[in-house]
Amino acid sequence: MAAPTSLIINSAFTEPQQHWAENADRTLRLEPARRPAGYEIIDTRENTRRQVPIPLVDTIRERVRQWRADGWPGTTAVTLALLQHWRDADKVSRRQYPFYFCQLEAIETLIWHLEALPEYRQGIHIQGDGGEFERLCNKMATGSGKTTVMAMIITWQVLNALTYPKSPRKYSSAVFLVAPGLTVKARLQVLLPGHPENYYDLFELCPSEALRSKLNRAQVLIENWHALMPLKEPERSVVRKGQESDEAFARRVLGSLAVCKNLVVINDEAHHAYRKPADVKLSKAEAEAMGIDLDEATRWVEGLDRIHKMRSIARCYDLSATPFAPTGRSNTEAGLFEWVVSDFGLNDAIEAGLVKTPRVVV
């Protein structure tokens, strides 16, 4: 076929129905189905690239699709009210900022994992990262609205925690948000319910004034990942206090949240936070060439481990456009986080018109 004049072929507000596929000669053809979940590995040394499928995500997509069609069986009354409010066709048409399909699918997948009836989750095992607390990851392209998904996670968790305080599902009204830098931390302040430009009001996340009022009781702490670094003793200190204890660390990092237990953690740009496998032998120079800060990655997770030890992390939600970590198989290869449960990548975002598209030369 002739080269396309536009790469945008899907609506941002409905599930993708088609995608561009690449022929052997690098030309494009239109496939009449949603793009299977996957990612691309590029070897710059060999000038090659290959597609790696994520079959687990494809299976989860189908389960979530069926669960949605059946009316989300198993959800609490609060969760059902939220899902109906977010999906309501009449409300969507009059919303100033309607939700993208990828945002709804991301939050639905997290809810499905915790609340769907067992038959909708039967046979599905999500591999963790080897740590003691559960992690789930939404793979979402930059520009697809990750911050809104974080606001939806907080709304869902907090309202359920306050409504069902004895629920065995361990919802939490205490949320610890970890940002990859000070600029992002400043941008995430809109996730504080009392912020004048908060996302809960901007995106009309609560179906009633009563629930919106209840949401104000959320305890949300937003910190830069550097807060998770061990405390260094001043070099000129006369009195040697010794290494900071785990309890002192938890109190210092969590501040007002230090009185809480069973926290929910949200990692923004979570590709900065992973456990370095023992078989990964990377020098600092090699890591830098891959765009990896090994110290940041390990310190980030080590800090969360210490918090889990003292306060317990009910679950951890990771959001990232590039949730990859070194595999140890080669210096140029990175592997996908094994706890990715949804995928809306850069190509999907381009085809839905959510990010700027490269100019197509005809």
What are these regions (language model features)?
Residues 1-362:
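RecA-like P-loop NTPase motor core of helicase/translocase proteins
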